[in-house]
UniProtKB/Swiss-Prot annotation:
Binds 1 zinc ion. SMART domains: SprT (SM00731). GO terms for molecular function: zinc ion binding. InterPro entries: SprT-like_domain (IPR006640), SprT_Zn_ribbon (IPR035240), Uncharacterised_SprT-like (IPR023524). The active site is at 68. It is found in: Cytoplasm. It comes from Shouchella clausii (strain KSM-K16). Zn(2+) binds at residues 67, 71. This is Protein SprT-like. Keywords: Cytoplasm, Metal-binding, Zinc. The lineage of its organism: Bacteria, Bacillati, Bacillota, Bacilli, Bacillales.
Length: 154
């Protein structure tokens, strides 16, 4: 899907579900990692994560667009557009938009380190500089053991 097709889809959804036109820009942003999309308050544009579309398809993308359009239309009307606001939650329910999107991360990995002195194991999501950090129990040297994949998304 191109940005032009995304723009047309967003305008169509806005008219169908909100009975209001979407007059700004909707585009894909490859730098989005932990979110499905975002509404930009200053420019009123909507940015969407292309990985959500690639991984979960058009239905999930439509749900994310509806969610961001709730932010968009409520903000332009001067009503509560934040997640905790009552107006926003009512509009989510009315349009059938999801409150959260599915996760976009490919896999969840854990790095396993062990102490060379006391054999204590450490499970971390981020790398540890073994030259700088030591065991919290005995101050022994840490050694990298393995990288485990907890679960892989399909």
């Amino acid at each position: 899907m191109t940005n032009k097709e995304l723009q047309q889809l967003t305008e169509t959804i806005s008219l169908a579900f909100f009975k209001r036109p979407f007059t700004h820009t909707a585009r894909f942003n490859n730098r989005l990692r932990t979110t499905g999309g975002r509404y930009l308050l200053k420019s009123h544009d909507i940015e969407l994560n292309p990985k959500q579309y690639e991984r979960y398809g058009k239905e999930e993308l439509i749900g994310i667009i509806k969610h961001e359009l709730c932010h968009y239309h409520l903000h332009l009307e001067g009503k509560g557009y934040k997640h905790g606001d009552k107006d926003f939650q009512e509009w989510l329910a009315k349009t059938g938009a999801p409150r959260y999107c599915k996760t976009a991360q490919d896999e969840q990995t854990v790095l396993v380190y062990t102490c060379t002195s006391c054999s204590r194991t450490y499970h971390r999501r981020r790398k540890i500089n073994t030259q700088k950090y030591v065991c919290g129990t005995c101050h022994g040297k840490l050694k990298f053991l393995s990288k485990k994949v907890l679960h892989q998304r399909k």
